[in-house]
Curated annotation (Swiss-Prot):
Catalyzes the conversion of dihydroorotate to orotate with NAD(+) as electron acceptor. HAMAP family: DHO_dh_type1 (MF_00224). This is Dihydroorotate dehydrogenase B (NAD(+)), catalytic subunit. InterPro entries: Aldolase_TIM, DHO_dehydrogenase, DHOD_1B, Dihydroorotate_DH_1, Dihydroorotate_DH_1_2, Dihydroorotate_DH_cat, Dihydroorotate_DH_CS, Dihydroorotate_DH_I.
Length: 303
């Protein structure tokens, strides 16, 4: 078997396969289906400083090659996570990573400070696609300045591995990635969902209560792959690739484009065992190509 281990900053992972936030619960929900300890890293659902009810229903819609979601970061807040969830998941034998969201910079900072105290949480993933309520609702991650401000503030408060999740809904994602790196990010993950919408023609109404939502699934893969390739060339920190990864071949393509690790999202809803199948598929690919380590294929695309 090939060496599948990779490092994301100081975070050591047994393999490059991770789960995307919001698609794998807190990990424990999948333990009846697979050995979740085999996964390189589990990113739990988005956590905010205070409880959020999320958006009204309907907030999910199927599309021809993926799905739209407008869940709205529904969660019970970081205190609930610390008191109720953390004790249940802290002994899972893999990297448990918390996705952190907020409506203001101080929300991100306070949440990160609380999670920093949890010994068994070695990293956070910062969701900077959230709207900044103090700046008219514009998402933090759509400008280099906005991204830099929130990443710098969290970096000062958080002492472990800091992953910054980038929005694809921007003019130049490499500019945002460089801003995150310069502000102290240990890694960037991309892409978050693309903004899309669905319409019920008979009712002449939008399908989602919010009109628009986040597009994910196979349809976004070519866009995600291109952005990962661009960002991997633009920064010197590890890149985590996600967006439309449905099988091992997709995962290998992202790594060839420069990703040090990958996240699987929408595919978890289709096949609860997809993470394990992807890990096995990557190993088989490496053996077939005579590679002793997965690191040999990171950025190995010949252009």
């Amino acid at each position: 078997m090939a060496d599948l281990s990779v490092n994301i900053g100081e975070l050591q992972m047994k393999n490059p396969v991770m789960t995307a936030s919001g698609t794998f619960g807190y990990g424990e929900e999948f333990s009846d289906f697979i050995d979740i300890a085999r996964i390189g890293g589990i990113i739990v659902k988005g956590t905010t400083l205070h409880k959020r009810e999320g958006n009204p229903y309907p907030r999910m819609a199927e599309t021809p090659s993926g799905m739209l979601n407008a869940v709205g970061l529904q969660n019970k807040g970081v205190d609930y996570f610390v008191e109720q969830i953390y004790p249940r998941i802290k002994d899972i034998q893999t990297n448990m990573i918390v996705n952190v969201s907020g409506s203001a910079i101080e929300d991100y900072v306070k949440t990160a400070e609380i999670i920093n105290e949890l010994d068994k949480i070695p990293a956070i993933e910062l969701n900077i696609s959230c709207p900044n309520v103090k700046q008219g609702g514009m998402a933090f991650g759509v400008s280099a300045k906005g991204a830099s401000e929130v990443v710098k503030a969290v970096r000062a408060a958080y002492k472990k591995t800091l992953i910054v999740k980038l929005s694809p809904n921007v003019t130049d994602i490499t500019e945002i990635a460089r801003a995150a790196e310069e502000s102290g990010a240990d890694s960037v993950s991309l892409i978050n969902t693309l903004l899309g919408m669905a319409i019920d023609a008979e009712r002449k109404r939008p399908i989602l209560s919010t009109v628009t939502g986040g597009m994910s699934g196979a349809a976004v893969k070519p866009i995600a792959l291109r952005m990962v390739w661009q960002v991997a060339k633009a920064v010197n920190i590890p890149v985590i690739g996600l967006g439309g990864i449905m099988n091992w071949k997709d995962a290998v393509e992202f790594m060839l484009a420069g990703a040090s690790a990958i996240q699987i999202g929408t595919a978890n809803f289709i096949d609860p065992a997809v993470t394990i199948k992807v890990e096995d598929g990557i190993n088989n690919y490496l053996e077939r190509h005579g590679c002793k380590s997965v690191k040999e294929i990171i950025g190995a695309l010949e252009v």
